[in-house]
Amino acid sequence: VVIDIMPSSRRGEGLGYYGLTNNIAMSIGPMFGLFLHDGGVSFATIFCYALGSCMLGFLSASLVKTPYKPPVKREPISLDRFILLKGMPAGLSLLLLSIPYGMTTNYVAMYAREIGIHTQTGFFFTFMAIGMAISRIFSGKLVDRGKITQVIAAGLNLVIISFFLLASCVYLIQWNDAACTILFFGIALLMGIGFGIMFPAFNTLFVNLAPNNQRGTATSTYLTSWDVGIGIGMLTGGYIAE
């Protein structure tokens, strides 16, 4: 729907804002959940809040009106109805990049407590969301100018640096607690900028690889790679933590 209603000349910018809402939600969710948990709220109540958010999302989606689009005749069962074959290399790359994202959103709070960062770790996701919002200032327009791979490479470099610094916190905290805490939240900001410019650029890349009648398939491939990568990150992170 988003792809069909925006002009192609501003596709990168539009998909950037669309992706921003998804990424920020992935940051706000853990932050809100951690704040509730640290405040003594039961897990049952936390999941009730999650259910309420889902119901609001469903209500909002049901209010969206779109112009009629005639169906495209295809084979009843075919792989290209679900996966954009031309986008498989990009899908594998996105999957691998989503694995550390899944690990971070689920286990960074445990990591902070384990190394001795005594602060509200939920603010990590606040700064991450701020970083993602900052990324929208420039990345969408760069993508619209055709610099998709350059934007992805820049985001990747920022993410690599942020994970290196995150791993270094275990040593820095032995030297200075306050400096480590500041760095910890600075890492979240940097990581948010990195992921915030990469993921929408990937979405635009998938759409550009597909013909007009396969834009939905392109977005499906993008989201499948994203979801599978995050799932692998959660499982792998849990296995490593145990």
Locations of regions flagged by a protein language model:
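Extracytoplasmic gate region of multi-pass secondary transporters
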Residues: P89-F124
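C-terminal membrane-cytosol helix-exit motif in multi-pass small-molecule transporters
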Residues: G52-P70
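Cytoplasmic helix-loop-helix junction between adjacent transmembrane helices
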Residues: V1-L20
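Small-residue (Gly/Pro/Ala) motifs that create kinks and tight helix-helix packing interfaces
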Residues: A25-H37, G233-A241
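Intracellular juxtamembrane helix-capping segments at the cytosolic ends
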Residues: V1-M6, I197-A210
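Juxtamembrane intracellular "pre-TM" segments in multi-pass secondary transporters
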Residues: T66-S93
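C-terminal transmembrane helical hairpin of 12-TM major facilitator-type secondary transporters
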Residues: T149-F202
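Helix-to-loop junctions at the C-terminal end of transmembrane segments
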Residues: R136-K147
